[in-house]
Amino acid sequence: MLRFGANLGPGMLFSEYPFLERFDHAAAAGFGAVEYPQPYGEDIRAIRAALQRTGLRQAQFNLPWGDIPGQRGTTNDPSRRAAFRDDVARALEIAAELECPRLLCHAGVALPEIPFDVQWNTIVDNLHYAAEQAVPAGVRILVEPLNPFDVPGYLLTTTAQALRLLDEVGHPNTALLYDIYHAQRAEGNLTATLRAHLHRIDHIELADSPDRHQPGTGEINFRFLLGELQTASFAGWVCPEYRPLGSTEESLTWLREWTTRE
């Protein structure tokens, strides 16, 4: 049976409610976990209380993205190595407080003044450091490709690039976050990719393409893809990360149909 979690990030599921109230609505809708990108400006004790109150799990959250809008991480910046290590420590402290077993480390947006190979090697070194630091905490480090239309300049846009990065990092405490929406926009070939690489995927996010709304509003056959994941006994969380058309509750028809089918 697939496990579904709700993305409570800005503009995503249950955004019509204040942040901490979204946990209650997610639990009432049948989700077993939540995720959101950046908890750093929130009251962590209040989040922990919301998780305990609702019985939800914290599936994952991101390492800090940095101070520049659109930055998507400092992992590629050789001048920010010390700051990156501080960010890892901070994220691991919060992960311990929230009993969160995964942290997502974005690769960053290209820095035009720095050669690509320098940025790439910085990412490799930083990811290895993060993965090693996370071992004692029982936290796995994830990487995620993002499509170049939504995030221009982002350094990982395909599954192949992300897997190459993980191979070069060479640490067993790393895995791939596969976002079905970003993958469809960037490269397509969803089914073949899942079949070939599901053993390296620890977490899945989804939205329909091309407009990032709920399943059934675009070009992706989610009934088929979810069936593939079910057949393969995928054990990670599957988290819708979309902008609902209508209310969030109205947008969850696809989930109710799937759970009834199960």
Positions of PLM-derived features:
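Glycine-rich, proline-tolerant flexible connector loops at the mouths of alpha/beta enzymes
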Residues: 35-54, 62, 107-115, 150, ...
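Anion (oxyanion) recognition and catalysis
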Residues: 27, 52, 96, 131, ...
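Alpha-helical segments flanking ligand/cofactor-binding loops in enzyme cores
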Residues: 24, 48-49, 93, 132, ...
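Active-site acidic/histidine proton-transfer and metal-coordination neighborhood
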Residues: 74-175
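Conserved beta-strand positions in the central sheet of alpha/beta enzyme cores
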Residues: 35, 59-62, 104, 142, ...
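Generic structural signal for helix capping and beta-alpha/helix-loop junctions
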Residues: 43, 68, 112, 144, ...
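N-terminal small/glycine-rich loop or linker at the start of catalytic domains
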Residues: 1-11, 60-75, 107-111, 146
